[in-house]
A protein has these predicted regions:
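Patatin-like phospholipase
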Residues: 1-40, 48-229
């Protein structure tokens, strides 16, 4: 385990996170353990497999099953209003073909933080791990893609992807007292994003009940670019 002032920050990025998963696998092979790990969206999912010390698990999910209609696809989007099937990812099928090491995860001394965007406030809420069942609900909330997934609820509060409010949560690690911070990004340094008037209009219609969320969705890409720099 590294010294207590070292933190690991993991950006999300859907299938781009396979790169991040590879970096984490190397950390595990070299027995590099950070005492504090924080992630959003796919980064939070990768972090869970990093803490359970299951080399290759994150990559296998997104490589071996990317074409599996049980896991991802527009058919599931039309039927269940979500492009990802979280019941497949966290449910019985996963336990059969790639069981998660809950004991290793629950017995780890590493601090694990997951960020999700509160739809009512447009701000990031942070959750620490509890039981595995509670964790799966938190991870679903953090990975709920805007427009492509139905809202997730925790204690009656609606949430979407943690990357909307805080894609690279370095500020949270700093606020928690960590001075040495390693950040794994899933976008190239040269990444630039142009705001889309059409997409912004869709946000305003789709999330009209949540004006703070709409504002955050519209601002999201500019914030990502600023944090990367």
């Amino acid at each position: 385990m590294l010294k207590n002032d070292a933190a690991l920050v993991l950006e999300g990025g859907a299938l781009r996170s396979v790169y991040e998963a590879g970096v984490l696998d190397v950390f595990l092979e070299k027995k590099i353990e950070f005492p504090y790990v924080i992630g959003v969206s796919a980064g939070a999912l990768n972090a869970g497999n990093y803490i359970s010390k299951q080399i290759g698990r994150s990559a296998r999910v997104n490589i071996d099953y990317v074409d599996d209609p049980r896991y991802i696809g527009f058919k599931h989007l039309l039927r269940e209003h979500s492009i990802f099937n979280f019941d497949f990812l966290f449910g019985e099928p996963t336990k059969e073909w790639m069981p998660y090491d809950e004991n290793e995860f629950l017995n780890s001394n590493q601090k694990y933080i997951v960020g999700a965007t509160n739809c009512k406030t447009g701000k990031e809420n942070y959750f620490e791990r509890h039981t595995y069942k509670e964790l799966t609900e938190i991870l679903k909330a953090s990975s709920t893609l805007p427009i492509l997934s139905e809202l997730s609820y925790i204690d009656g509060i609606p949430y979407i992807d943690g990357g909307v409010a805080n894609a690279i949560p370095i500020d949270k690690a700093i606020a928690d007292g960590y001075k040495k911070i390693v950040v794994i990004l899933t976008r190239q340094k040269e990444f630039k994003s142009k705001s889309s008037l059409f997409i912004n209009a869709v946000y305003r219609i789709y999330y009209r009940k949540y004006p703070h969320l709409v504002k955050k969705c519209v601002q999201c890409q500019n914030v990502i670019i600023r944090e990367q720099n």
